[in-house]
Amino acid sequence: MLGFTNIDDKGQEGIELGWQDILAGKSGSRRVIKDRKGRIVEDIESILKSKPGKDIALSLDSKIQYRAYRELKLAMDTHKAKAGGIVVLDSQTGEVLALVNLPTYNPNNRTGRNGRKARNRVLTDIFEPGSTMKPFTVASALEAGKIKPDTEFNIAPGTITIGRRTIRDAHAVSIEEGLVTVEQVIQRSSNVGTVKISKLLPAQTMWETLNNSGFGASTGSGFPGEVKGMLHLPPWRPIRQATMSYGHGIAVNLLQLARAYTLFSEEGKLKPVSLLKIDTPPAGEQVISRKTALAVSKMLEMVVAKGGTAPLAQIEGYRVAGKTGTTHKVKAGGGYEKKKYVAS
């Protein structure tokens, strides 16, 4: 996150590079007379006044940052993951309270630093978000008036065919259990249900919801090397629209995804993110209606309740909302790895 400087104290990575001009200031110049030994004997005039560097205050909370690091390391050790990232946002202000990447390195000891450890994965790496994209498909359909939270879909037998491709839910669905509401589609994370919802939408409508939610564009964090992700413009083939509805064929960075989810806690408003402390929180832009945001937020609370995909995320005494997502890792030459995953 902080990055480092070179021997001349010029920022090379991270915050040090992104805010170099503010931190370093600018050198000045003056006209002088020197004696034959190079000593200044008379100051003639100032040509350019110097500007001292300024301090900046990061929005990071040291306690949250440490706990995020500790929990990420524990989760990676438990699940034997090769890499991971956590970002914590204040949804009311857009401030980044914690941003953690592993593996990492000690900037005070550069002997162990390499490209794999040095890059800020939260901002510079993209991944297919998988089922974490389903709430945005539902939000788009709610906004368009195509569905209501209690609209029912039949997802039995747990498969749906689009052209020559068959899309499956994680588990087979019996005829008796096949009729589910939109709320249950999100709660159970049904691919089939989400695809059926997406088929009610024009591609342009779905794209506009995703684009307005910040996907396919920079978050504006100012961090060097931040990627925009990938969001294809319509028109889409039916199979692309189907797979995008549950988070395949679209790529995001972790900060983009976290920022987009603040829509549901901020009654449909999207605010810019900031790595620096801000005095006056921005008003934000209304992306979806308050009614839609509250409806989806309720569905996300069902995800972490009994019957959802993440009941262990419940915290006694607190309202918790969330969404799980799992995708196969994309191969370098195309296609997907069979036994390598990205989990959100």
Set out the residue ranges of the language-model regions.
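Solvent-exposed alpha-helical segments within well-ordered globular domains of core cellular machineries
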Residues: 17, 66, 70-73, 208, ...
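Extracytoplasmic/periplasmic mature domains of Sec-exported, cell-envelope-associated bacterial proteins
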Residues: 25-30, 84-85, 238
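Flexible, solvent-exposed loop/hinge segments and secondary-structure transition points
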Residues: 9, 72-93, 101, 126, ...
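Conserved, well-ordered alpha-helix/loop/beta-strand core segments that scaffold catalytic motifs
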Residues: 41-84
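Short, polar/charged loop or turn motifs at beta-strand boundaries
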Residues: 5, 55, 280-283
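Beta-lactam-recognizing serine transpeptidase/beta-lactamase-like catalytic domain environment
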Residues: 35-45, 60, 91-131, 136-344
